């Protein structure tokens, strides 16, 4: 009987389902953007709330919104640029590692502190452990101030390339801690890395503990006979290609030590890096109330800068290497453009006009190079080869996204905004062509990837160029308490969009909306900032007549950088919002 009742009920339900038609749901209707709170009281209204999948017939977003990340962008013109940023983030994510050594667990972007710090320009936005690797390098600093740089398993024989005082072995972990002695960039990179990490965490106590060790590292670079050339007042290194870790001597593959009787030279990138570090140390000391120390570091920085321009400047850019105890490898050192020149654009050592001259040199060489771009590791390359690498191979002339990123960022700051965007656009198209990949180096003629290093290094540089150059969001203090806001979306095809950045680890978000119209343009900035230094690029051919901030008219300064014009104003946000309307 029980079975018959259940069977009857199921049968009746089936009949009901077969005969009853589903009623259509009411048609969906999107809200009128003019009625949104973000447009209340504003004359220039945002038209398309973002994120969205389509703007009319244009697919402008993805189904699950992978554009929404730090940093991320959505535009009404299409999804390609947002997809490119997503792909670049994945390239950086792929280098994340854990290293287990001496009872510690370290989060590393690869096992080299150099790569870790260069890649921090990207991953600082989402990583939650920014200090474990830095702490290990700080804690193992040598008594004279030298830092170690890489952790490798013992059967990777990097530890055999250096003298005993440049290595520590951890046999229980089968690991080695090594300093390739001929490298001359680690001490200044540690200053940069610790400052970047602190901006995210806001941990003043941590930075105070690190500060004496960072200062000791720069003192070592500017005093030790292996590092410092007293006659020129500049840092020196063995005669390498730019910042790389081998010389033209075939023996340098297995011996990476500094031997002062071997060819030595002064490379500009080591010195612009130390100059930047000195100014960063001055800024940190000033923040902590050490005015005398801050003044001393600034004075040392200016002396170093003066020596750089006296001995290395060729009138347009810094020459590659100044040989000290040997003849130049060829006749082209004074005209050789090396990758550290792109970095120098962003180390505050050049005036605006000097930056423009450097950018002009890259643009001119783009027209004459046989390669597909001007993103040189070095140009001209050494011929017939450098330690077995012919022209165009590895750092002897291959093309690099890290040069592209630094060059683009520098271009945005010196009135070459359209060129900066052109570089980013070319990179984005390469990423799309290669199914979301970006490689460490490329053959200049064929465009094929060469490998030889971490792709994330270049991806992070490009992300940084987008974040601080194109989007123009610069953290001037800690956790975005003070922001320089210098967006350059006016040189892109994106008339309306949204940009997101921030620090996941400290739960800080910067959310930017923009739109360009016939009557003017508008930026809506929501952030943790207590003060905002606005520097808003005006579209070419337009003249700004008025500025409103949060609906109220405000005085502004019209500044000029090259041929570009900017609306400048110092603003105190209201409830986390600074809303800029600029009228023509």
Where does each model-flagged region fall?
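Sec-dependent N-terminal signal peptides
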Residues: 5-14
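Catalytic cores of carbohydrate-active enzymes
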Residues: 25-69, 75, 82-83, 108-112, ...
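The feature captures the catalytic groove of carbohydrate-active enzymes
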Residues: 26, 39, 104-105, 152-189, ...
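Asp/Glu-centered strand-loop micro-motifs enriched in Gly/Pro and often flanked by an aromatic residue
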Residues: 70-77, 83-113, 117-121
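Aromatic-rich carbohydrate-recognition surfaces in CAZymes
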Residues: 109-237, 267-271, 275, 397-408, ...
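Aromatic (Trp/Tyr) and acidic
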Residues: 257, 261-264, 330-365, 394, ...
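Non-catalytic C-terminal accessory modules of carbohydrate-active enzymes
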Residues: 406-584
């Amino acid at each position: 009987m029980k079975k018959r009742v259940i069977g009857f009920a199921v049968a009746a339900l089936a009949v009901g389902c077969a005969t009853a038609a589903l009623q259509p749901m009411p048609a969906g209707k999107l809200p009128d953007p003019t009625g949104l709170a973000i447009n209340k009281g504003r004359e220039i209204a945002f038209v398309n709330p973002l994120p969205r999948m389509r703007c009319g017939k244009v697919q402008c977003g993805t189904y699950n919104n992978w554009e929404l990340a730090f940093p991320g962008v959505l535009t009404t013109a299409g999804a390609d640029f947002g997809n490119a940023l997503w792909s670049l983030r994945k390239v950086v994510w792929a280098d994340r590692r854990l290293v287990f050594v001496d009872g510690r667990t370290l989060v590393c972007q690869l096992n080299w502190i150099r790569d870790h710090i260069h890649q921090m320009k990207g991953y600082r936005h989402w990583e939650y452990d920014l200090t474990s690797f830095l702490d290990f390098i700080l804690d193992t600093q040598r008594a004279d101030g030298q830092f170690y740089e890489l952790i490798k398993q013992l059967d990777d024989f990097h530890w055999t390339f250096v003298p005993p005082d440049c290595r520590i072995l951890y046999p229980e972990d089968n690991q080695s801690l090594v300093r390739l002695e001929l490298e001359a960039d680690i001490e200044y990179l540690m200053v940069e890395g610790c400052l970047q990490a602190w901006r995210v965490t806001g941990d003043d106590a941590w930075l105070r503990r690190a500060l004496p060790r960072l200062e000791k590292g720069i003192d070592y670079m500017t005093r030790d006979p292996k590092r410092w050339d007293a006659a020129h007042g500049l840092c020196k290194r063995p005669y390498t290609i730019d910042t790389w870790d081998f010389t033209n001597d075939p023996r340098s593959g297995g011996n990476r030590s500094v031997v002062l009787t071997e060819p030595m030279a002064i490379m500009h990138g080591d010195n612009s890096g130390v100059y930047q570090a000195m100014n960063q140390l001055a800024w940190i000391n000033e923040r902590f109330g050490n005015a005398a120390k801050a003044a001393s570091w600034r004075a040392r920085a200016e002396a170093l800068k003066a020596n750089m321009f006296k001995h290395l400047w060729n009138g347009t850019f810094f020459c590659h290497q100044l040989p000290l105890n040997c003849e130049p490898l060829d006749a082209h050192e004074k005209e050789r453009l090396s990758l550290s020149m792109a970095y120098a654009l962003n180390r505050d050592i050049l005036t605006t006009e000097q930056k423009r001259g450097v950018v002009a040199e890259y643009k001119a060489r783009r027209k004459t190079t046989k390669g597909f771009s001007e993103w040189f590791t070095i140009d001209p390359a050494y011929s017939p080869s450098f330690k077995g690498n012919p022209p165009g191979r590895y750092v002897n002339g291959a093309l690099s996204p890290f040069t592209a990123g630094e060059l683009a960022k520098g271009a945005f700051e010196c009135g070459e905004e359209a060129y900066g965007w052109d570089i980013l656009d070319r990179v984005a198209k390469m990423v799309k062509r290669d199914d979301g990949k970006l490689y460490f180096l490329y053959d200049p003629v064929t465009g094929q990837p060469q490998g030889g290093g971490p792709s994330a290094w270049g991806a992070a540089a490009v992300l940084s160029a987008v974040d601080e150059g194109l989007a123009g969001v610069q953290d001037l203090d800690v956790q975005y308490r003070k922001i320089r806001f210098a967006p350059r979306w006016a040189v892109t095809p994106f008339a309306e969009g949204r940009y997101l950045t921030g620090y996941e680890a400290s739960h800080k978000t910067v959310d930017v909306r923009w739109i360009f119209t016939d009557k003017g343009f508008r930026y809506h900035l929501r952030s943790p900032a207590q003060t905002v230094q606005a520097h808003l690029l005006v579209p070419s051919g337009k003249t700004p007549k008025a500025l409103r901030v949060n609906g109220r008219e405000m005085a502004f300064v019209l500044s000029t950088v090259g041929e570009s014009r900017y609306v400048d104003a110092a603003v105190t946000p209201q409830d986390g919002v600074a809303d800029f309307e600029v009228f023509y």
